[in-house]
Each structure stands twice: as structure tokens, then as C-alpha cells.
Amino acid sequence: MKISGPFVVACLAGLLSGLDTSVNIAFPAITAAFEIDVSQIQWVVVSFVLTYSVLLLPAGRLGDRIGHGRIMVIGIVVQGLAFVWCSLASSFEFFLLARVSQGASMALILGTAPALVTLSVSERHQPRALGIFAMTTAAGLAAGAPVGGLLLQAWDWQSVYAFRVPYMGVLLVAALLSGLHRPGVMKSKQPLDLFLSLIHI
């Protein structure tokens, strides 16, 4: 199986999605920083998950129309800005708005990542490619909590967002070098399979 730029970008995006579990470790610190009740912290998760779930399928369909590569690049840019916003939020309300933007951009990224995987390899290699993609996502899920714990030992809760800003820079460079920003790149000939769209819900 030939490893292409779009495939690498998709796998890096999968790893990124798993790393968001680092946020859970920061809940006590976020609660204290914004002086909110413990019951309110659930909105940190709800604001992200609800936005992500609602927009995931439309993002995949939009990728079918204008190219999954361009949608991926847009998602990467907005996600990076969302991490900066989360890190600099001065109030809980602004922080939740940042989480909404993070959920929306993650929908753009993961709504197109499975399509990038399948479109970048031959049909014969698609099962293996999707398996590698799933493994990178699982690696992110496994690493998120330990990474979050290490960051909180050294810095404030904002670090669980700030450390991903450089990651997004690397991901954006990789996407641009792969030509994903060009019109029509990685455009599906057929609508994205429902299973692939739901793989990250």
C-alpha cells in the first residue's frame, strides 16, 4: 500500500480527535478557574459533542460536492483558531462558544477524514488503510488522558488546548503540501458511505 499525503493527513486528524480526551482531566481546574458549579462543567462536553454530531454528516456531504480536501483544510484552520480561543477565553460563556466552534471544525475534519483515506488508496487496500486510520484514532484516545495529566502538572488548564495549536500548524502544512486546498481535490465520485460518516460519532 502506497502512503500518500492525504492519507497521512487523515491519520494525523484521527490522532488529533482522540487527544481531546485530555480535556476531561482539566475539568476540576476549569471549574475552579471560572468559578462555576460542578453541574455546569457538563456543558463543556455537551457543547462540543452536540455541535459535532449535528454537523458531521452534512460535512461529509459537503465534501462530496466540493472536495473533501478543501473541507479538511477549512476544518484544520478553524480548529486551530478554536484552540487559541479556548486557551484565551476570559469567561465561561466565551469558553463554551469556543467549544462550539471546536465541535463544528472537528465535524469538518472527521466528516472528511474517512473519505480521504478511501480515496487515497486502491479499493483493494481500503480495509487496511481504514484499519490504520482507526489505530491512530485509538492511539489518540489512549494518549489524551496521560498527556493532559502531564500538562496540568506543569502548567494551567489552558495548556490542554494550547499544546494542540502547534500540532494544527503541522497538520495545516501537511495538508497544503498534499494539495488538499485545491478545488475538487479528493472529491468523491459517489456519496460517502453512511458507515464511514458515522465511524466517529
Stretches found by the model and what they are:
Residues W43, L196-S197:
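Transmembrane alpha-helical segments of multi-pass membrane proteins
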Residues M1-H181:
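Transmembrane-helix bundle of Major Facilitator Superfamily
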Residues H181-L194:
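Flexible cytoplasmic inter-helical loops of multi-pass small-molecule transporters
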Residues I199-I201:
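Conserved small/polar residues in nucleotide/adenosyl-binding loops
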